Amino acid sequence: MMLPRCFVTVLLMSSVLYIGGETSSEVLGPVVSTEAGSFQGMELTTHGERVIYAFLGIPYAKPPTGLLRFKKPQPADFIQGTYKATEKPPSCFQLDSDLQLPWADPDSPMKEDCLFLNLWTPASLSTEEEELKSVMVWIHGGGYTSGSSALDVYDGQTLSSSGDVVVVTMNYRLDAFGFLNSLTEDAPGNMALYDQLLALQWVHTNIKYFGGDPNKVTLFGESVGAFATSFLALSPLTKGLFQKIMLESGSAYNKLTVNSIDQAKNNNQLATLVGCANETFTLISNPEEVVACMREVAPAKFTQTYYKELGSEREKINFIFWPHFGDDILPTRTAELIKEKNLTALFAGVNSVEGSALSVFFFPEVYQMFVESNLTLTKAYATILMNEFFKVFNFQDSAKAIEFYLGDVEDDDEEGIRSALFGVVGDYIITCPTIYLADKYSERGANVQFYRFDRRPSTSQWPPEWMGAAHNDEIQFVFGMPVRYPEKYTEEERTLSEYMTRTWTNFVKSEDLKLKNGSQWPSYSLSEPQFATLQTNEQIIGSGQRKAECDFWRPYFDI
């Protein structure tokens, strides 16, 4: 499957909101001795004068450089002396695209030596078993080509202090560094997932020294971070590393996976562009030599130069830097993996207009046309765009899908036409795969609760009101940005953020979720697929979210 490079930036912007500044005071904190070494963190006085400790930039793997580039990660060496864990780590090398907005740029330097994690913990730091805190481990989104645990929006201090939990965020390798596949151990693909696995193993071994309970770990993520979270939940290699998951806008039923052979064939194009392969000397025919050559290529050449060599944005393709099935971490496809797992608790949800931001990056010129030139979106043009979208995914029943979404929309109903376009993109990529996994968890007897985020942030980077609550808009509320930066938000948004951080951390601690009025959050089941809205006005309980749309798509997914 060949994806336009502009589409990669869709999920790229996922989870990379940056709002600068800090509100907490910082002083050196205690030294914590672990099985990985001794680490000195910072003491933070957060909102409400709560004190927590932050340990930033802890290495969990050896630098994936030199001979270790493109290989599975190796555990970091034991640290001699005391490691000063007071600065967020560098970001992993990632895409430099003209489509990224300024606020989507990483707020730290990019380095290949980037496999670090950060953690925030309540100041008690008790290691007594009965006093250990529940743990939340976050996997950021970004299309597997962008993102960083150093971004301010992922600062875990508010979650930790408000919810009395330990919060962990991690970097993992991106783009070619995380997914190059030569069909050999020199570059086996899925390195990013193995990075995440190693970080979870580090947490399991060491989190008790920071006051966290290794037996009460919840893994959560957004967009491809949610994809990865649910993949890891189904992997045979993660047994005992975490107990439940939370998914924000995404699941393992997504269409953005590949088989190894196709991945290697497409990765050969990258090897050719950086001067390490040609028509007769390929990544598949000569993997050892080609990968050895690629280890000598400057990191920036992978993430910048070769994309620019491909010409226009429309011509840029995704070299299929996505997870693949068929190795130890993902032995087979999601539908088979899920049969083998004992599924426990799931809290999941989507945003009300997932497809708006995704459509903008899939067709960036369209957004500019409608916003800057005030043009009208017609059914004819929407049909062209939908057909282009379906070509990317090699979807054969495009006429049937277009009729389903546009057939009953009047020619002069621009709002309805726009809603249909956003629906196609959002339903296919995010909303329906998330619902399908919730269905499967419920079918297997797991405790499932579902939300729909409905608030368009006052800090939104999207001028048109019709963008709505777009992909990734909920993250700033989950991590408490309105609490940390009240001057940038309304009082209603601050209240919503406080409620959401409480909801997320309550799920982690007890799964006892409450609605705003104090009543019980509804359970999600196949017979009653109930959800609760997250918005600044009255909370609504709904059922069968996007039911007709997801029933339409269901036969096209391997569930």
Curated annotation (Swiss-Prot):
- Tissue distribution of the protein: Expressed by the venom gland.
Q: Which InterPro entries match?
A: AB_hydrolase_fold, AChE-related_enzymes, CarbesteraseB, Carboxylesterase_B_CS, Cholinesterase
List the signal peptide residues: 1-21
Residues annotated as carrying Phosphoserine in the record are S223
Its annotated compartments are:
Secreted
- Offer one example of a GO biological process linked to this entry: choline metabolic process
Q: What is its EC number?
A: 3.1.1.7
* Record-linked PROSITE patterns: CARBOXYLESTERASE_B_2
Q: Would you identify the family this protein belongs to, as annotated?
A: Belongs to the type-B carboxylesterase/lipase family.
| Name under which the protein is recorded | Acetylcholinesterase-1
